[in-house]
Amino acid sequence: MIERIWSGQSRLYLLLLPLSWLYGAVTWLIRASYRLGLRSAWRSPVPVIIVGNLTAGGNGKTPVVIWLVEQLQQRGYRVGVVSRGYGGKSAVYPLLLSDNTTTAQAGDEPVLIFQRTGAPVAVSPKRADAIKALLQSHAVDFIITDDGLQHYALQRDFELVVIDGVRRFGNGWWLPAGPMREREGRLRSVDAAITNGGLAAEGEIPMQLVAREAVNLVTGQRQPAEQLQHVVAMAGIGHPPRFFATLNLLGIKPENEHAFADHQDYSLAQLSRLTSGPQILLMTEKDAVKCRAFALPNWWYLPVDAQLPSDRADKLLLNIQALSPDTK
């Protein structure tokens, strides 16, 4: 239902407009208070790159964070990542991730980024505290914040917005009548915009999510995803239909599809009921980090990588590298 409302297919959004105007007013006042100097924002001693969204829901932000970390690492830079840690609850903040950190403590996205990139990752509701903790333990050249475009208590050196190229900005209204955290005009003040799928508007950098080989959660075996048989697909991400569409593009026709809420916790009892007989369960990598501890032998996940045009990617990276006093 919420997708129909946000996409403009349902006029029920009209009932939510008073709340949206309130949300928009509060958001504007918060940002204005920092711009006018009424509230002070903390500045990191190393450059901060925000990777965020204008809209709620899955836009492909985490693959962009992973891509950016890996690209800077390949160029010889030391990169740290901070996050709010949505979906996790730690007894102590800030929390520096280790090999023993669980998604229940840190959230699924920080754990995924940590496992994929090997970069130091810290989480805290106050991102400045996360950065301070990270810098006390690691020497880094850049800090990348996973989300946080609207977290104006943190000064930033580069703002990168990720846009869903298919859904774009829906009906254009603020939450909850629409998907917007801030209005579309905010794009005029960011440093770069990456468009995930669909058609990129002028000035936006097009991006595609490219699937890798499927990986077995228990054995680590890799296999072309299109060779998997009797697939039951599941996705607990911001926009599950994107994962199911990726499978269709690979020629995979799942026998069943199960969409779960973003950041949802799973149990063995819950997921084991989704398959029977020769069926296998195929999930996103973000789901896999929450399931590996109790996975069954017929569970697989499908990693995806962000892919950008090389010329646009090089220009973006050069602009970011220029922020470092140690430009390589």
From Swiss-Prot:
One of its GO terms (biological process) is lipid A biosynthetic process. InterPro entries: LpxK, P-loop_NTPase. Transmembrane segments: none annotated. Keywords: ATP-binding, Kinase, Lipid A biosynthesis, Lipid biosynthesis, Lipid metabolism, Nucleotide-binding, Transferase. One of its GO terms (molecular function) is tetraacyldisaccharide 4'-kinase activity. Pathway: Glycolipid biosynthesis; lipid IV(A) biosynthesis; lipid IV(A) from (3R)-3-hydroxytetradecanoyl-[acyl-carrier-protein] and UDP-N-acetyl-alpha-D-glucosamine: step 6/6. It catalyses: a lipid A disaccharide + ATP = a lipid IVA + ADP + H(+). Its EC number is 2.7.1.130. One of its GO terms (cellular component) is plasma membrane. It comes from the Bacteria. ATP binds at residues 55-62. Belongs to the LpxK family. NCBIfam families: lpxK. Transfers the gamma-phosphate of ATP to the 4'-position of a tetraacyldisaccharide 1-phosphate intermediate (termed DS-1-P) to form tetraacyldisaccharide 1,4'-bis-phosphate (lipid IVA). This is Tetraacyldisaccharide 4'-kinase. It comes from Yersinia pestis.
